[in-house]
Design a protein with these regions (language model features):
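Conserved, mostly hydrophobic/aromatic
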Residues: 46, 57, 111, 132, ...
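Histidine-rich, glycine-flanked metal-binding segment
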Residues: 1-51
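Active-site gating loops and adjacent loop-to-helix segments of metal-dependent hydrolytic enzymes
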Residues: 64-96, 172-175
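Di-metal (Zn2+ and/or Mg2+/Mn2+) metal-binding site signature of metallo-dependent hydrolases
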Residues: 47-69
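Metal-coordinating catalytic core of metallo-dependent amide/deamination hydrolases
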Residues: 90, 117-185
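Short coil/turn connectors at secondary-structure junctions
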Residues: 1-2, 38-39, 45, 110-113, ...
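Hydrophobic alpha-helical hairpins/lids featuring a short glycine-rich hinge
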Residues: 51, 82-126
Length: 185
């Protein structure tokens, strides 16, 4: 059994500073002036304690890539997609994983524990999807990561993309994304 006592927390809906007693990962009591024996006592000195944040739209496969291989000088989505295609030619699974892990750690440090990322599932080698599935497994004790199979190059505009999307789902992606503004439909 593990216990944590968080002292002097500022919480939404509470006028006064509040204490939180956590027993085996569950809030056992929330109130002022709590005094329980605990394995760990943390005085947060009036800082905000809240439920974790959710970042519902990330592209962890593309993070930390500004200027690689070049800058998007027009600022348009189409140029950005073209640059992504150029970047994919030399992008390794290890680079994707390292960048994703770094950004996940930043997210967690800033209060996010639930993340949804889009993974380029139409990239023909499967590198992106495999990398992010591995990162999800590696980081599962730190964050809840949902992976959306994202058709960066559309589903129906290119032969074989339907199969790539289906494969991404079989490998373990949680949802299917889309690009309705670019898809032939």
């Amino acid at each position: 059994m593990s216990t944590i006592l968080i002292k002097n927390a500022r919480m939404r809906g509470h006028q006064e500073l509040t204490d939180l007693y956590i027993k085996d990962g569950v809030f056992a009591e929330i109130g002022g002036g709590l005094s329980y024996p605990a394995d760990e006592i943390i005085d947060v000195a009036g800082k905000l304690v809240s439920a974790p944040f959710c970042d519902a739209h990330l592209h962890l496969d593309a993070v930390l890539s500004v200027g690689k291989p070049r800058y998007n000088m027009s600022g348009t989505l189409i140029e950005g997609i073209n640059i992504w295609g150029e970047r994919m030619q030399g992008l390794t699974k290890e680079t994707i994983k390292k960048n994703a892990r770094d950004v996940i750690k930043w997210e967690v440090a800033n209060g996010s524990m639930f993340l949804r990322t889009h993974a380029d599932a139409t990239e023909p080698t499967g590198t992106v999807v495999e990398a992010l599935l591995e990162v999800r497994e590696e980081m599962k004790d730190l964050v809840d990561l949902q992976i959306v199979a994202f058709p960066q190059e559309c589903i129906f505009t290119e032969k074989g993309h339907t199969d790539l999307m289906e494969n991404a789902m079989k490998l373990g992606c949680d949802a299917v994304g889309g690009l309705p503004y670019m898809e032939y439909s």
